[in-house]
């Protein structure tokens, strides 16, 4: 969120600064020629107008529809500031952004999380109520290699050694394929579904995902905590997962925009949200 939030704030500042003078006012003078506010606005609108307007509308709609406490905004803002360290103030000065502009973006982000939370059902929470498991895998590019690895495992060869020999996952191969502990929603669906069907020390058949073919071994299954104790964590994970789902987010935001009765008067941008609806319909047909 951090760099994106600064970028969003920067574009908002540009848009707002363009509105602060009359259209004929010069914002740049030089021997090569002057630039008026109107010229600047038209150029900005051509290059990034739809994205900037989309972000500004989304921000207003979310903040209006979902109440976020000031203390929560301050907490998230402080976390963000801490991550940037000494660079934070420098970045704000370089881009001409005020802290309040960043805080507005943070408020919109937290409001968005509330909007996503509202869509999560008890059924979804219970479906994702699974024990924390530890697994290792051997990731290969093709099915033939996966079958070869599986055959060698059947001959008694070490899973860890075969991971070092064959695995394409540079992050885990030198650890014998160890991925550590994870819960529901942390892995791609095909991997997760297969892993949760295994007993401790059981090895899967080759599992195909977008990354290739996995041979999975579950090495530990933790005792499951009571549902009420982990419900909040499950919800947080689902919010993060849904926020990465472009189709879900488009659908969610179009519903929010429809409720807000958004109308765009600028002739060049008036079809912005109609275009989004059309794009959503195309995605649904795929």
Swiss-Prot record:
Q: Where in the cell is it found?
A: Cell membrane
Q: Which GO terms describe its biological process?
A: protein folding; protein transport
Q: What class of enzyme is it?
A: isomerase
Q: Where is the signal peptide?
A: 1-18
Q: Cite the positions of S-diacylglycerol cysteine lipidation.
A: 19
Q: Which reactions fall under this protein's catalytic activity?
A: [protein]-peptidylproline (omega=180) = [protein]-peptidylproline (omega=0)
Q: Which keywords does UniProt give here?
A: Cell membrane, Isomerase, Lipoprotein, Membrane, Palmitate, Rotamase, Signal
Q: Does the keyword Cell membrane apply?
A: yes
List, alphabetically, the GO terms of the cellular component aspect. Answer: plasma membrane
**Which residues are in the PpiC domain?**
130-220
Listed Gene3D superfamilies: 3.10.50.40, Trigger factor, C-terminal domain
Please state the Enzyme Commission number of this protein: 5.2.1.8
Membrane topology type: Lipid-anchor
For this UniProt entry, the molecular function terms from Gene Ontology, in alphabetical order, are: peptidyl-prolyl cis-trans isomerase activity
Which Pfam families does UniProt cross-reference here? Rotamase_3 (PF13616)
What is the protein's major site of localization? membrane
Q: Among its keywords, does the record have Acetylation?
A: no
Q: Where is the lipid attached (N-palmitoyl cysteine)?
A: 19
Please give the PANTHER family that the UniProt record associates with this protein.
FOLDASE PROTEIN PRSA, PEPTIDYLPROLYL ISOMERASE
Family, as annotated? Belongs to the PrsA family.
Role: Plays a major role in protein secretion by helping the post-translocational extracellular folding of several secreted proteins.
The identity of this protein, by name, is Foldase protein PrsA 1
Gene for this protein?
Answer: prsA1
